[in-house]
Amino acid sequence: MGGRVSVELPKRDPPPGVPTDEMLLNVDKMHDVIAPAKLLEYVHIGPLAKDKEDKVKKRYPEFRLVNTGPGGLSALLRQSYNGTAPNCCRTFNRTHYWKKDGKISDKYEEGAVLESCWPDVHDTGKCDVDLFDWCQGDTFDRNICHQWIGSAFNRSDRTVEGQQSLINLYNKMQTLCSKDASVPICESFLHHLRAHNTEDSKEMIDYILRQQSADFKQKYMRCSYPTRDKLEESLKYAEPRECWDPECSNANVNFLLTRNYNNLGLCNIVRCNTSVNNLQMDKTSSLRLSCGLSNSDRFSTVPVNRAKVVQHNIKHSFDLKLHLISLLSLLVIWILIVAI
């Protein structure tokens, strides 16, 4: 029987551990990484000492601190969005902000607390109450209010809460604008109603405009509420009144009733220079000129002096030589006879 032979292998110390990417993370340098996290999304923040946990929780109150591994490895789990409507709704570019001592900033500074805005906050109706009031005040941004009203007609939120918010907004806008449609937010509302181009939107436009005061109609709606003389004059023309009435061509289209707006869209208005060579008129004829005007007065409401226009055209028209025309006619007839 042979004996056993044992070999003693050399001993070596194990190689030093190599930290993983997660272990190299530093929560104090991750402000811009943590803030955009979506609802229920984990953000790994690396090892976190016990004495820093309270500080991190205070800085990120919208997140729950979660242990993910040995050595204090941790992560933050988003649970909520704490941004307020005034800070989130009155701009379309803000996703979060940092609040400290009652002041907000887009950049983190020591001691600040993160407050985040709901994703697509303008698409969910969460801004309707705040912006409805703000857009009637003295400090509103007209572009923001115009975009918000426009977005209301294209929302993808089909939840019960979202649809109810939209209905409430339409009702409040209708009530507000029926009193005075010249309010900027109402003019935007009428503009987007017109662009929406449905039967319901057209009916709402006409309802709102018909509720306006007599002063409003006299100032802004003279196309939709013409004088008796203007209506009688319109009987002389085959084209719609909206095509030649300066009160229509100069009108704010947001304040036109639907029938006037549609008629105006049928017009083919051309500005040109006119030369009349031969003009015959009687007592029932009517002459209206709109050509040759500058851009500033191209829709001038000053009446045309028809007698002077006719006299000017006759004076400058070429003189017809009837005897010469007769001779030419006889010559043509003779040539035709000879040719046959």
UniProtKB/Swiss-Prot annotation:
Keyword Lipoprotein: yes
Keyword Lipoprotein tagged: yes
Chain residues carrying a lipid of type N-myristoyl glycine: 2
Post-translational modification: Unglycosylated because produced in viral factories instead of the classic ER -Golgi route.
Coiled coil: none
Any one GO cellular component localisation term in the record: membrane
Compartmental location: Virion membrane
Pfam families: Pox_G9-A16
Membrane-side (Virion surface) residue stretches: 2-319
Signal peptide (residue range): none
InterPro entries for the chain: Pox_virus_G9/A16
Inducers of expression: Expressed in the late phase of the viral replicative cycle.
Domain of life: Viruses
GO biological process, one term: symbiont entry into host cell
Segments traversing the membrane: 320-340
Topological type in the membrane: Single-pass type II membrane protein
Subunit structure: Interacts with OPG143. Component of the entry fusion complex (EFC) composed of OPG053, OPG076, OPG086, OPG094, OPG095, OPG099, OPG107, OPG143, OPG104, OPG147 and OPG155. Except for OPG095 and OPG053, each of the EFC proteins is required for assembly or stability of the complex.
Function per UniProt: Component of the entry fusion complex (EFC), which consists of 11 proteins. During cell infection, this complex mediates entry of the virion core into the host cytoplasm by a two-step mechanism consisting of lipid mixing of the viral and cellular membranes and subsequent pore formation.
Family, similarity comment: Belongs to the orthopoxvirus OPG086 family.
Protein name: Entry-fusion complex protein OPG094
Organism: Vaccinia virus (strain Ankara) (VACV)
